[in-house]
């Protein structure tokens, strides 16, 4: 059987990398020939999780077609978030927990999407449905993915399925998920050794909203005031990225993982900024606004932005 790649989105987070590893393992057990790869280097949080459970980081690819004819996608479906030559390969499987947008295929495929907090929660279900034992390492990296995406089960995206998966996977992995989870999340909050250009690209996704190219980036911190001391430099980096990549609006969500509050920085035209203000019913003050309780790009940012841009 010809090999297929399994990968998550660009600027991969712990879900994108961890779930690719787990889903590749599952598919190989089901008779496929797959390799988990990544569309970027792991961030500090993901690197912490990989090291904890004894994984090497998946190799990074820029294109898929030179090596494979078919691919499996996890944690994304929108082509602008995928590998650069996604139009040159056949997508045979998708497992995701996001909206479906701009996605179509020439052939039938396996597509599974559920409104849960993390893609690994769906893959955990698939292991159980197929009666395939989850190894300790795989359980650990899936647990890490769910903790990451749900902010230790505190995000509004968290479902009972996520909670059940965390309990089960922590038992297999042999860790206290609360202690491990907090340590892992904190490992991803050190922003002092990174430039503003790096930080706004670490966890960023592009969305097509009614003809507008909107970029939404997020960084997690434990000291929000300290992060905001770099506000001017962040805005400058966001302006440059917008000019270089034709973004109509760039939003940076800076989230305090300890109290689940965020501050947003926004650059764009007067029109796109007005859409932002309409989405959150708040006025920007010098390109900045407080967003109490907002921690999820998927559930609390993209839906209101979509509504505002489409109004």
UniProtKB/Swiss-Prot annotation:
Signal peptide: none annotated. Its cofactor is Mn(2+). It is found in: Cytoplasm. It is an enzyme of class 3 (hydrolase). Its EC number is 3.6.1.1. GO terms for molecular function: inorganic diphosphate phosphatase activity; manganese ion binding. It comes from the Bacteria. InterPro entries: DDH_dom, DHH_sf, DHHA2, DHHA2_dom_sf, Mn-dep_inorganic_PyrPase, Oligoribo/pAp-PDE_c-di-AMP_PDE. It catalyses: diphosphate + H2O = 2 phosphate + H(+). Keywords: Cytoplasm, Hydrolase, Manganese, Metal-binding. Binds 2 manganese ions per subunit. Mn(2+) 1 binds at residues 9, 13, 75. Mn(2+) 2 binds at residues 15, 75, 97, 149. GO terms for cellular component: cytoplasm. Belongs to the PPase class C family. HAMAP family: PPase_C (MF_00207). This is Probable manganese-dependent inorganic pyrophosphatase. It comes from Lactobacillus acidophilus (strain ATCC 700396 / NCK56 / N2 / NCFM).
